[in-house]
């Protein structure tokens, strides 16, 4: 019995699937060091006042664990996963996995612009420089 993954229509039948990379950005909003640095550089001391910058936006729902499991099961053709982070990592993450490339913000953002908490800048710059 063949299990349908939902990816069959995207996969070439001749197994000549091009290798691609995934880029994923992640932040642990519960990290006290990250919170402290964010507060120090924030224009607005009370982050809850600004709708777009609420603490809930940075909450770790632990969904990343399932995302990695899904990639491993349904997208084995992925060549590399570039994991872009402020510097912290989930405790459960296998840092030695051969497909994983851990990228710190300081690896691709010029020092004069760090730290940055602008997700748009992080995402666009990581796509260009990784």
Residue ranges and their predicted role:
Residues 59-63, 110-122:
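A short, glycine-/small-residue-rich helix N-cap motif at loop->alpha-helix starts
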Residues 67-70, 121-126:
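Short, hydrophobic/aromatic alpha-helical segments in well-folded domains
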Residues 128-130:
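Conserved small/polar residues in nucleotide/adenosyl-binding loops
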Residues 2-107:
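N-terminal anchoring/stem segment of glycosyltransferases
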């Amino acid at each position: 019995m063949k299990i349908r993954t939902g990816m069959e229509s995207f996969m070439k039948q001749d197994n000549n699937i091009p290798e691609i990379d995934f880029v994923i950005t992640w932040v642990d909003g519960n990290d006290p060091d990250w919170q402290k640095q964010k507060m120090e550089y924030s224009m607005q001391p009370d982050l809850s006042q600004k709708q777009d910058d609420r603490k809930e936006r940075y909450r770790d729902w632990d969904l990343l664990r399932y995302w990695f499991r899904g990639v491993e099961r349904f997208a084995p053709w992925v060549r590399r996963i570039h994991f872009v982070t402020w510097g912290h990592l989930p405790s459960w993450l296998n840092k030695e996995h051969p497909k994983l490339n851990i990228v710190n913000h300081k690896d691709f953002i010029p020092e004069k612009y760090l730290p940055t908490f602008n997700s748009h800048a992080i995402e666009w710059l990581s796509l260009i420089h990784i």
